[in-house]
Amino acid sequence: MKINKFSKKPLDAIDRTNKDLVISYPVDKKKNNNLKILLEERKKIDLINEIIIPPRDAKCFTVKAGQFFRIECFEGSQVGDLNLFNADNLNEKFYSGKTRALYGTHISVGDKMFSSFPYLRSLAIITWDTLDWYGYDKDGGSVHDVIGTRCDPYTYKLT
């Protein structure tokens, strides 16, 4: 939060700032108890389709409940944006803000990707990550971030 000092401190400011910490999203509540099962199921999957997406392009595909899909960069260093929608209700879509609130700025194995209000449910679960070796670099950067929105051509036109 930016502190601009425009407003006056309330008389009870000390009491307000000394309140006990409230954990909004307890770690034990977000634990994925199904991860072991999902990892076993991954061993049984068969490739049913392959889609190659050229750089600076996009493709849509449908993944049914219970199916797996893999995103793989096999040529160069690419940045890929992922948008998830409920195929039966396009109003329900990936909500990076809630996912970030629950799992932090970067997601990986076991983390769920949540949908928007009023649905707020898991649209996908990450079951494998070939880039988990990367961790965080010296600049604090990592992979699979949910810091902002996906590509938006209007971002660069803001004044």
Show which residues each predicted segment covers.
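Acidic, Ser/Thr/Pro
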Residues: 1-159
